Each structure stands twice: as structure tokens, then as C-alpha cells.
Amino acid sequence: RKEVEQDPGPFNVPEGATVAFNCTYSNSASQSFFWYRQDCRKEPKLLMSVYSSGNEDGRFTAQLNRASQYISLLIRDSKLSDSATYLCVVNIRGGSQGNLIFGKGTKLSVKP
């Protein structure tokens, strides 16, 4: 089993739809979790940090289930500009640097 697993997609959704991505991780000692967004041929940018059970920011909600070792990202009222690759990132050691493991990413395409 890989350290971090994601469904690669692509998810094709109409504008305004709600879409959810799931990600599982194999190291139960992991302390912190992140969702990054990557636009075509650009550096990934931090979208959301998830430390306890979840986090919410506008149309984006991240949830963490430590017992099942998965995190999810929910995007409500999707917009054309949400089209990107979403990377699930797990810090498998403590500390600020730790050891970040990136998932392969889930591709989202929002259509008008």
C-alpha cells in the first residue's frame, strides 16, 4: 500500500456542482495533512491545512478521519476556475519540516 493514495480522476463536473475527493494514508502516526492545488505546469500551492478533524474555508471543506486514515476535500458550488489538480499531502513526522509525502493528485475539470 502506498503512503498516500488518491483517485487520479479526472472528475468532470458541471459548474455549480459539489465535488468530493478522498485520500487515504498508510502511516497512522501522521500528524498533519494538507490539500494543495496545482495549476497546469505550475508549482503546487497550499489550499488548506488539516490538523484535528477538519477545516472549512469558504466553499472548501476538508475532513480528517484518523480511525479510517483518510482525508477528504469537498468543493461546493464549483467554478470554472476550480479546474486544477488537487494534491493530498501527509506529514509523516512531527515538527515543522517533518517529512511531506505528496499524493499523485486528483484532476478536476469544471465545465460550463
Whereabouts are the PLM-identified features?
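Extracellular domains of the immunoglobulin superfamily
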Residues: 1-112
